[in-house]
Amino acid sequence: MSVAGPTLVNVTDTRGTFALTDMPGVRLQDADFTVVDVETTGWSPGAAGITEIGAVRVRGGEVIAEFTSLVNPGTPVPAPITELTGISDPMLALAPPAAAVLPGLLAFAEGSVLTAHNAPFDLAFLTAACAAAGLGWPGFEILDTLKLARHLVSTPDEVPDCKLATLADYFGAPVQPSHRALADARATATVLWHLLGRLADREVYTLGELAAWLAEKDAEAAAARTGVAAVTARRWPLGVARAPRARTPQWLAGPRRWLARVPRLPWRRGRGIR
């Protein structure tokens, strides 16, 4: 059985794309987004490998190119993963390794905003694979559609959750996610464009405005919940707490030598901390 290497399909003229240095002022409808998805043998890049990469490059809501390749992870595919994705060891026997696929992907995505649903997962595998292959990781701008959806889609009023399958169904994506890389990337591309369409009501029109808006929303979300607070002195951590109000008196009521070691105690009250 022969397995083709990386495949480019539906390629059209991509002249007019923007370099990263030009991106902040680029309007959302004019920017290039490369939506990527990876399938893997497990959940951690330290113990698992990539089995498939799919990417869709979109501009103005239109697909201008697609990239897809099976990837030989160098290790057997666990049975539960084969059951989930349909990707098996025989399918990957003659597939290229990640080191042979990644240069094509990086070139495909050059000058675009790299986008994924739950981006930290995909990026962890891609960056680890690049490091293992001795490839430098470009300075991509990154957009996570999961994070964007959590700011723009009401749950549970509109949808019960912001999983890719839920959002793809809600927005009527012509291709539904199926735990195959290209299908999932296509579904994410549809979700992305519907989410970007909601930003006009927030007066967000450019990539720079989107970055600023996301930073503001992330800060608001962090302040609104009681989370993990790390309190540090100049060179060493004083402590970490999930209940800062309860823990701070304990820190400050300790031996006087602790207080003598604290030159400054920076803090800021958040709405989630009372």
Regions found by a protein language model. Name each.
Residues 1-48, 58-62, 90-274:
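DEDD superfamily 3′-5′ metal-dependent exonuclease/proofreading module
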Residues 57-76:
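Short glycine-rich, Thr/Ser-proximal phosphate-binding strand/loop in the N-terminal lobe
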Residues 75-80, 162-163:
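Short, glycine/polar-rich helix-capping loops at beta-to-alpha or helix-loop-helix junctions
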Residues 79-87:
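Short, basic/glycine-rich phosphate-binding loops at helix/coil junctions
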